[in-house]
């Protein structure tokens, strides 16, 4: 999505020759404000396929593995263990798979950097990298820390987060079932998180 696409592209442009991308989402019109892949010509296409095409266009010799599946606590090991991964960039924005991925990496001593929340924030100069235990002013990082502590993990991996306090007017209350609020995201911030990852 907004973070992972930019992270993957910059890694390929830096000369990294082996990349694995995992994403099961389709490109949607609601992402056009912040995702590099979200264009009229790509709407409805699988993000992993569009990204694979883009990365191969940058480096035709790229050794690229594409996994077009939704990562869950139940399948994280099955999806990742067959691959030799030297470093992992976590750009997941959904809590359960994010926790599963972080836990898998920490428990298997796989180095990673995890992107925290860019929603309701605007100031790119406030982006920081720190151990998860040192992150602050980020509601997503707070929840991640709390849930990971219950899993016996309190530190040991880097996160990209913003020290900016969330802007309350960027949070919209929703009346839809199973959705309490929607957090607005400015176009450039997820990309900045991805570049820093």
What is the predicted role of each segment?
Residues 1-197:
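Adenine nucleotide-associated cytosolic modules
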């Amino acid at each position: 999505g907004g973070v992972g696409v930019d992270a993957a592209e910059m890694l390929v442009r830096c000369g990294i020759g082996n990349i694995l991308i995992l994403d099961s989402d389709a490109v949607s019109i609601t992402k056009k404000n912040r995702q590099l892949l979200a264009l009229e010509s790509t709407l409805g296409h699988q993000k992993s396929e569009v990204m694979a095409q883009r990365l191969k266009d940058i480096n035709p010799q790229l050794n690229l593995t594409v996994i077009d599946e939704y990562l869950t606590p139940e399948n994280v090991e099955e999806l990742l263990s067959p691959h030799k991964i030297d470093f992992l960039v976590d750009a997941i924005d959904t809590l359960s798979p994010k926790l599963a991925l972080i836990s898998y990496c920490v428990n298997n001593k796989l180095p990673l950097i995890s992107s925290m929340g860019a929603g309701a924030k605007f100031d790119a100069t406030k982006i920081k990298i720190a151990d998860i235990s040192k992150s602050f002013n980020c509601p997503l990082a707070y929840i991640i820390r709390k849930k990971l502590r219950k899993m016996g993990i309190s530190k040991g991996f880097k996160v990209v987060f913003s020290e900016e306090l969330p802007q309350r007017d960027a949070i919209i209350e929703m009346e839809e079932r199973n959705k309490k609020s929607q957090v607005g995201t400015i176009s450039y911030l997820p990309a900045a998180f991805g570049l820093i990852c």
